[in-house]
């Protein structure tokens, strides 16, 4: 099984970004959604991204942002990848000179394959837990048996992942990547370095067990 990529999302401090990178995370996520308790402004985001070591991907998370807002952020913050968590159409996600992920929230009976197909330009599809009125960061897991065997795109698994359950998630779903926020926090927006290390170790040890 190829190495599962790991993203630590909801980073609000330079020290948490560096701790995630030191633990072995492949990417960190910055939330540009004012209603989130993990939101960062342009100045803080730029400071965090500039502090990252080489080969750690910076991801910007957006929820129904306007093109003007996106352009202002992208002009100031050197993000590598965009992640859209709202009701964006494919055309809203494209044309920003960055690859993008589209997040889809899982509901029983939903045609998730059909919904994913509506974003042919996406670099990957992120599956998250559905909670009405909450675009992400719910801290709740969904039924992993609902995940299709083939979305036609790299699959990023999110939603309620923790150091205790991510190994099982990787074994069952076999995602391209996993994405965690609340599951490695001391409080909202503040990461617990020990939990970050435990999360990364749980993912990596699952791969070692299968080789």
Swiss-Prot record:
Pathway: Amino-acid biosynthesis; L-tryptophan biosynthesis; L-tryptophan from chorismate: step 3/5. It catalyses: N-(5-phospho-beta-D-ribosyl)anthranilate = 1-(2-carboxyphenylamino)-1-deoxy-D-ribulose 5-phosphate. It is an enzyme of class 5 (isomerase). InterPro entries: Aldolase_TIM (IPR013785), PRAI_dom (IPR001240), RibuloseP-bd_barrel (IPR011060), TrpF_fam (IPR044643). GO terms for biological process: L-tryptophan biosynthetic process. Keywords: Amino-acid biosynthesis, Aromatic amino acid biosynthesis, Isomerase, Tryptophan biosynthesis. It comes from the Bacteria. Pfam families: PRAI. NCBIfam families: PRK01222.1-4 (NF002298), PRK01222.1-6 (NF002299). Belongs to the TrpF family. This is N-(5'-phosphoribosyl)anthranilate isomerase. The gene is trpF.
